[in-house]
Amino acid sequence: MPHATQLYQHVPEKRWPIVYSPRYNITFMGLEKLHPFDAGKWGKVINFLKEEKLLSDGMLVEAREASEEDLLVVHTRRYLNELKWSFVVATITEIPPVIFLPNFLVQRKVLRPLRTQTGGTIMAGKLAVERGWAINVGGGFHHCSSDRGGGFCAYADITLAIKFLFERVEGISRATIIDLDAHQGNGHERDFMGDKRVYIMDVYNRHIYPGDRFAKEAIRRKVELEWGTEDEEYLEKVERNVRRSLQEHLPDVVVYNAGTDVLEGDRLGGLSISPAGIVKRDEVVFRVVRAHDIPILMVTSGGYQKRTARIIADSILNLHDLGLIGPEFPCVSAQNSGIPLLSCAVP
């Protein structure tokens, strides 16, 4: 019997399946500026969407913090106890001065925002199944597994969202993860190693962190990119492999890890995708998945430049303008849309 949770409560129809909380953003005495990650990007995305009149506060779903019981669905108690040591959190977040902070401050100022984003991903999973789509304007902590964190990822939100669906939602027994962050998603790969219910497609720069050879064994469709890969090659590989993934394993839900660290100039991602290329990438994924009438959950994952918030907002606006998301969502396929994809042929 699943435990009682606050994350699977009813959401009124008037609210769009876009999940966010002001508590996502990490701010504490400027320490967040010591990491290249823009630790306030999530709020900036929402502000841009409000400025464009797409959303108001009353249309958003307020994320709730994942409880310890929620986290124990995936995480070991030993790992959660390790997070009570500031030096462990400093290592995971890659912000060395965190080691000198009392852990109660680390819990409140660093881990609580990450737990709230994790709760948001779990909530968005249920919403995606109910509404056909959902976006958590946060989450995507794809380097964290049940018993280890790293790369700014302290909680395994993708694994948690899928396991919650498997345990609590009738008819959800197969999932596909489409991970398009610039880095290999070794966390969910370790968690779902050997689990035939979960198909993982991962497109990443082969030369950068984490280089987890063991975790790569869980990838069913692996696309390794070279330094400086640009739009044309990238978009062709993404579309072709998304199509093939859905042919090989037709899931009940897709979790799309939409990292923007593929952006040109991102010194950690090492790829050269333009802002327009990222917007097109997200469009391609949504259109192909929705053409199969499969629910899709998008999380925003990595992105290490100040302009990534604007790009994420532009992508969400584009999905709305094309009718791929909205309050009354129509299933739009490449065939009945006036806006072409890349070539639909699969060689």
Swiss-Prot record:
Keywords: Chromatin regulator, Hydrolase, Nucleus, Repressor, Transcription, Transcription regulation. Its main location: nucleus. It catalyses: N(6)-acetyl-L-lysyl-[histone] + H2O = L-lysyl-[histone] + acetate. It is found in: Nucleus. The active site is at residue 143. It is an enzyme of class 3 (hydrolase). One of its GO terms (cellular component) is cytoplasm. Residues 14-318 are annotated as: Histone deacetylase. GO terms for molecular function: DNA-binding transcription factor binding; histone deacetylase activity; histone deacetylase activity, hydrolytic mechanism. The keyword Cytoplasm does not apply. InterPro entries: HDAC_classIV (IPR044150), HDAC_PDAC (IPR050284), His_deacetylse (IPR000286), His_deacetylse_dom (IPR023801), His_deacetylse_dom_sf (IPR037138), Ureohydrolase_dom_sf (IPR023696). One of its GO terms (biological process) is chromatin organization. Interacts with HDAC6. Responsible for the deacetylation of lysine residues on the N-terminal part of the core histones (H2A, H2B, H3 and H4). Histone deacetylation gives a tag for epigenetic repression and plays an important role in transcriptional regulation, cell cycle progression and developmental events. Histone deacetylases act via the formation of large multiprotein complexes. Belongs to the histone deacetylase family. This is Histone deacetylase 11.
